[in-house]
Amino acid sequence: MVNLNETVLGTELAKWDKYLDNFRDTNYFKKLKLFLKEGSRSKKFNTSIFEVFKPFDMVDPSKLKVVILTDTKHIHGGLPYGKMYNSSFDHENQEIETIKDSIELQFKEGLNMDFDDSLESWANQGVLILNSSLTHSSEGKDLYYKVWRRFNAHIVKCLVKNYTGIHYVFMGGKSIYYRKHIKSASNYVYNVSKPEKQSVVNFSAFKEINKKILEQNGEEFMINWTDYQ
């Protein structure tokens, strides 16, 4: 079993090592490790420390197609959850439900569909989903997004530097902060300034992404948003 120290050092970030080697030596990253250790020991967080970096373990950066960065606190057992990949059918997740509604409208003409709430099928297709805060307070308060700002900015800047043709979806004011790091000429950007149900349901990005992938790479590279893989 991976222990706390290994997790904080980024065991689940192994696939992303080429982007993080020097970053791990910064004072910021050292402080981030202490923050995670102390938060875990004092039970400040509402999610397991072993799952903080889970999205990075699930997505191979060399296969990356889409980055969705959101700041809506995902609901897990009545408390805000830092990211989406470890959601399950028996936990309410308001944002996943809203995104699901949007995809049903775009691809299923509003009909209900079978939906993988864990979003593992998306991860396998190169869709990385991050929250502006990878940890949230066990009290349900939005306290930590500033702690994660430099980490998320580093990830985005490294992706922009190393890859072109990535589709970046920003959902919420805090997430749009990272838009300034994107070179729109070589990537694609989609914004939802207020990720409320109505605005996201009418959000056409998922269909637009597939349209551009079809034009650039062919049908076999399109994201299957609606079905299990």
Label the predicted regions.
Residues 215-218:
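Long, solvent-exposed, polar/charged low-complexity segments
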Residues 11, 18-167, 174-177, 182-184, ...:
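A polyanion-binding, active-site-adjacent surface
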